């Protein structure tokens, strides 16, 4: 039965006959209704809809950030440079799915290349490779004036 349920927001809208603007999803973590901006961000991050008791759920921005922090703290395994990840997995980083450990967006080629070129490590968290997207990279490297 789970295989027949829509896995993303676009398929959910199509299969249920509800327009994106009329879609209302609750957050799986805090149960609040996602705003239109949060629904858009959820879709753009290519996150899957979660099904509980026959109902679809998403995740709000605040809970996604919090869950990323919790997962990083509880489930961080180790970190490697891009070359180390490629050596360990026997695959080019370009063919692997790597998500941002902060916002969960899949990294695009340019973001993966930036990790390689600027010698930034990727992190194995709960068995999956994670890095920083462009937005979170800038957010994490902001210098606070003294």
Swiss-Prot record:
Subcellular localization: Host cytoplasm; Host nucleus
Query: Keywords of this protein's UniProt record, alphabetized?
Result: Activator, DNA-binding, Early protein, Host cytoplasm, Host nucleus, Host-virus interaction, Inhibition of host innate immune response by virus, Metal-binding, Modulation of host cell apoptosis by virus, Transcription, Transcription regulation, Viral immunoevasion, Zinc, Zinc-finger
Q: Start and end residues of each unnamed zinc finger?
A: 27-63, 100-136
Q: Name one GO cellular component term.
A: host cell nucleus
Q: Where are the transmembrane segments?
A: none
Q: Which GO terms describe its biological process?
A: DNA-templated transcription; regulation of DNA-templated transcription; symbiont-mediated perturbation of host apoptosis; symbiont-mediated perturbation of host ubiquitin-like protein modification; symbiont-mediated suppression of host innate immune response; symbiont-mediated suppression of host type I interferon-mediated signaling pathway
Name where it mostly resides.
Answer: host cell
Which GO terms fall under molecular function for this chain's record?
DNA binding; zinc ion binding
A single Pfam family it belongs to is E6
Task: Give additional notes from the record.
Answer: Belongs to the low risk human alphapapillomavirus family. The cancer-causing human papillomavirus E6 protein has a unique carboxy terminal PDZ domain containing substrate but low risk E6s do not possess this domain.
Function according to Swiss-Prot or TrEMBL: Plays a major role in the induction and maintenance of cellular transformation. E6 associates with host UBE3A/E6-AP ubiquitin-protein ligase and modulates its activity. Sequesters tumor suppressor TP53 in the host cytoplasm and modulates its activity by interacting with host EP300 that results in the reduction of TP53 acetylation and activation. In turn, apoptosis induced by DNA damage is inhibited. E6 also protects host keratinocytes from apoptosis by mediating the degradation of host BAK1. May also inhibit host immune response.
Q: Which family does it belong to?
A: Belongs to the papillomaviridae E6 protein family.
- Subunit composition and interactions: Forms homodimers. Interacts with ubiquitin-protein ligase UBE3A/E6-AP; this interaction stimulates UBE3A ubiquitin activity. Interacts with host TP53 and EP300; this interaction inhibits TP53 activity.
Q: What is this protein called?
A: Protein E6
Identify the species of origin.
Answer: Human papillomavirus 28
Instruction: Provide the organism lineage as a comma list.
Output: Viruses, Monodnaviria, Shotokuvirae, Cossaviricota, Papovaviricetes
State the gene name recorded for this protein. Answer: E6
